[in-house]
């Protein structure tokens, strides 16, 4: 079989930078799926992407499908011929459909009888005749939320398409993609290199485009170059560049010929909190800030341009002129905001509605303040500082800086609190109240910060559930899932002695008559249980372990964590699955019991050696188990219970539980109930698989 390398490039207008990687990866995955469905072999495949192009290279692609034999079974021989040995209508119809006569059919003998069989040789189709259709289907499946039309064309895509190049080796693959006919012309850089290039071979795509077109279509190489050049530029300044990956990805997607340059701004702007300057540089301008070894912002920034200039200083000056007014705005907002304290802004919070049924932001901070103080008493934090931080937690929403740069809420609260003479614990709590903001974000660890962060999230959760606006499907306008995960992570990662039932009840009490949904506490608790499951699944804990713990519905996050770890460890023991099966058997037996069982086991009614042994073993373990369960030491307790495996196995082998004698039966059921109760102190291990 012969092989060749394939190139497919779609040349477009500038693609959305934040979607570029996803589009390219999806294009590749979709196309390789098409190749597999078509049974076309290939060695490897890679994607390329630049602002005005999506491309894929497939290496060592088979030039045709392999020939194959397809077996088509017909009717059973017994039904294929009549009593005189003549073909029946069913047999003739089947044969005709396969282009043969009944006499030409083979026979297939099986254990169930003999059948007519046609072995059809299917000649493989040439790859080049399949490529265009496969590529079009691959493009049709791209994640494009809002496709657009252009010109008089009815074709839709994420951006207008100008060129399509499909080369199988040196041969142009005939066909159209998105209404554009395939040829070997690719476009170079808008302002450098050749505007259009005739590509001779698929293998030369990257090199020709780079050398003649001044376009580096290798996304990862472009990203690595930007990163290396930016690090080197920062080192020359005696600092380190903030090369956050999301921004690095976005900048990589904005340029096809990256040139890294360094610029500066006036040192006076460093009097403004660094976060505001960084937000302006990164968010608005896509610049990389530079910090010294102590983490202090330097009056410099690094940016990436898309052109090699004969006079780079002109580009540098232009970017400095662009950023200066933005930094001046931040300076003005900061100086203006400093004239009023956070406390003085509380009255203005009365004019801002949090949610129609839940009142104003002022009412919200009063609830958060009370809730934070309540939590503080449970975890040993300073309740006065917690209450103060809760009260001031939303005051920065009324500042000019946060109104202009909304992502700085909390952060600016911290800076203004310090200027107002608030304690450091209060100031830091204002900054950390929204943590964790995203998956992988850190959680607050300072006691006052913990109190405010928990109070803020619980107020939202209980309030929104309390007015009947729980999340439905993927819709979650109040980010309740993130809030719930945040509560759990803060409790778990700080090993806090808090119970969700108690926290929910306190939050409900503080909302007072605002809430109209009587079932809110139960619904919020159930919501947390769902988040527990999602959280532990993300940590790689098997579903059966999670379900075993969920069956006991522990409501203290730290306790839930202890049980999860214990059951996960128990599951690795040699005795685990046998005891899980035994517990399931016990559960099924007890589920059928009507009426109450004896509260205690009557030793006089233990007649079989196996039941005596099990009862004795249980009696021996119970004094050891009680303090372990009381201390939530579930792992040691389950390890002790694992020693029951032999006694339990022997019991079920030798003892008839449902004895004819009612007293014996009830006593044995009581024994099994006692056995199961011990395991249920930790989890329902009958759910382990």
UniProtKB/Swiss-Prot annotation:
What quaternary arrangement does the UniProt entry report? Tetramer of two alpha and two beta subunits.
Q: Name one Pfam family in it.
A: DALR_1
Q: Which domain of life is it from?
A: Bacteria
A single Gene Ontology CC annotation of this entry is:
cytosol
Q: What is its main location?
A: cytoplasm
MF annotations from Gene Ontology: arginine-tRNA ligase activity; ATP binding; glycine-tRNA ligase activity
Gene name of the encoded protein = glyS
Is Ribosomal protein given among the entry's keywords?
no
* Enzymatic class: ligase
Q: Which UniProt keywords apply?
A: Aminoacyl-tRNA synthetase, ATP-binding, Cytoplasm, Ligase, Nucleotide-binding, Protein biosynthesis
Q: Per the UniProt record, which EC number(s) apply here? A: 6.1.1.14
Q: Name one GO biological process term.
A: glycyl-tRNA aminoacylation
> Where in the cell?
Cytoplasm
This chain's protein is named Glycine--tRNA ligase beta subunit
Q: Which reaction does it catalyse?
A: tRNA(Gly) + glycine + ATP = glycyl-tRNA(Gly) + AMP + diphosphate
The UniProt entry's sequence similarity note says: Belongs to the class-II aminoacyl-tRNA synthetase family.
């Amino acid at each position: 079989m012969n092989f060749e390398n394939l190139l497919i490039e779609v040349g477009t207008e500038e693609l959305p930078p934040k979607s570029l990687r996803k589009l390219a990866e999806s294009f590749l995955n979709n196309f390789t799926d098409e190749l597999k469905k078509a049974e076309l072999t290939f060695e490897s495949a890679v994607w390329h992407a630049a602002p005005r192009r999506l491309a894929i290279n497939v290496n060592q692609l088979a030039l045709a499908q392999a020939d194959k034999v397809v077996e088509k079974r017909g009717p059973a021989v017994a039904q294929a011929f009549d009593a005189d040995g003549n073909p029946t209508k069913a047999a003739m119809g089947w044969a005709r459909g396969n282009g043969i006569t009944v006499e030409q059919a083979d026979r297939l003998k099986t254990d169930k009888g003999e059948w007519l069989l046609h072995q059809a040789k299917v000649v493989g189709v040439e790859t080049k005749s399949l490529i265009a259709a496969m590529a079009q289907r691959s493009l049709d499946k791209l994640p494009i939320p809002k496709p657009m039309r252009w010109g008089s064309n009815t074709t839709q895509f994420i951006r207008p398409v100008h060129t399509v190049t499909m080369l199988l080796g040196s041969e142009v693959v005939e066909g159209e993609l998105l209404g554009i006919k395939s040829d070997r012309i690719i476009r170079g850089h808008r302002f450098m290199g050749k505007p259009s290039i005739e590509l001779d071979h698929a293998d030369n795509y990257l090199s020709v485009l780079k050398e003649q077109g001044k376009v580096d279509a290798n996304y990862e190489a472009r990203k690595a170059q930007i990163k290396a050049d930016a690090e080197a530029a920062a080192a020359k300044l005696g600092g380190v560049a903030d090369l956050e990956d999301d921004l690095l990805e976005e900048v990589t997607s904005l340029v096809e010929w990256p040139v890294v340059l360094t610029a500066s701004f006036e040192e006076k702007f460093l009097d403004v909190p660094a976060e505001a300057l960084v937000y302006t540089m990164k968010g608005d301008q896509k610049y990389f800030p530079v910090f010294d070894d102590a983490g202090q912002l330097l009056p410099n920034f690094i940016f990436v341009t898309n052109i090699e200039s004969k006079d780079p200083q002109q580009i540098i000056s232009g970017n400095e002129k662009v950023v200066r007014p933005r930094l001046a705005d931040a300076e003005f907002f900061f100086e203006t905001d400093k004239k009023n304290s956070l406390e003085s802004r509380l009255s203005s919070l009365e004019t801002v509605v949090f949610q129609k049924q839940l009142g104003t932001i002022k009412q919200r901070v009063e609830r958060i303040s009370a809730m934070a103080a309540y939590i503080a008493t449970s975890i040993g934090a300073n309740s006065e500082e917690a209450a103060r931080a809760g009260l001031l937690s939303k005051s920065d929403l009324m500042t000019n800086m946060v109104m202009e740069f909304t992502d700085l809420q909390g952060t600016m609260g911290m800076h203004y609190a310090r200027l107002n003479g608030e304690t450091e614990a209060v100031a830091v709590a204002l900054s950390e109240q929204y943590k964790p903001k995203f998956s992988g974000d850190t959680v607050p660890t300072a006691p006052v910060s913990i109190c405010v962060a928990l109070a803020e999230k619980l107020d939202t959760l209980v309030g929104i559930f309390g007015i009947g606006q729980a999340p439905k499907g993927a819709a979650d306008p109040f980010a309740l899932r993130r809030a719930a995960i945040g509560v759990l992570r803060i409790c778990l990662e700080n090993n806090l002695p808090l119970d969700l039932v108690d926290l929910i009840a306190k939050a409900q009490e503080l909302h007072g008559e605002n809430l109209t949904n009587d079932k809110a506490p139960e619904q919020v608790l159930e919501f947390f249980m769902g988040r527990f499951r999602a959280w532990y699944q993300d940590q790689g804990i098997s579903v059966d372990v999670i379900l075993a713990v969920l069956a006991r519905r522990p409501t203290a996050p730290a306790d839930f964590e202890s049980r999860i770890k214990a059951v996960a460890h128990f599951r690795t023991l040699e005795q685990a699955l046998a005891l899980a099966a035994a517990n399931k058997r016990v559960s099924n037996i007890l589920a059928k019991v009507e009426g109450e069982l004896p509260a205690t086991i009557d030793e006089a009614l233990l007649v079989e050696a196996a039941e005596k042994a099990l009862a004795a073993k249980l009696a021996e373990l119970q004094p050891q188990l009680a303090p372990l369960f009381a201390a939530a030491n579930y792992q040691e307790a389950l390890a002790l219970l694992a020693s029951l495996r032999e006694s339990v196995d022997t019991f079920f082998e030798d003892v008839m539980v449902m004895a004819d004698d009612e007293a014996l039966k009830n006593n044995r059921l009581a024994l099994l109930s006692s056995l199961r109760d011990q395991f249920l102190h930790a989890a329902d291990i009958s759910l382990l698989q």
